[in-house]
Amino acid sequence: MSLTARFSCLSDYDPDALSVEQARAFIRSQLTPVGTRERVALRSALGRVLASDVIAPFNVPAHDNSAMDGYALRQADLAGSGETRLHVIGTALAGKVFAGAVGTAECVRIMTGALPPAGCDTVVIQEVVELDGDQVVVPAGQRAGQNIRLAGEDLAAGKPALAAGR
């Protein structure tokens, strides 16, 4: 075989390359296993590796809540096609529970972070509704569950919040 055939850019042959096993053995020889665990303050943890999972003690968010300012309603009240007119019966503020009951063809003005009133499964953002006195006109195409953050959506209680080895 000619020298140009052995050392061509079209060839995978490299006489100086390590085999996969040789490379793995070299990497293993350079590692120093961590033999101890220690508890450190969070401010001292930068650059450290977790020895075990950190488990979330509670859900984040703690409760279902509105992701947007808008109107909380029951998806079942929306027309299959076309717009729907609903009566606004109150306001749900963040940090407060709406005390009223939402009936058929009713909705509640809701702020970001507020708990959806009982029975309401959808939040329609304020930018797409048309306000007409104490009623709103909701356009077609709204999906059940839209704009509602579910309890535990970011972190679920009892599940790893941070994984070991990271």
Go through the PLM ranges and name each one.
Residues M1-G80, L150:
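Short, low-complexity N-terminal leaders and the immediately following helix N-cap/first helix
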Residues S2-P15, Y71-R166:
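Short, glycine/charged-enriched hinge/interface segments at domain edges or termini
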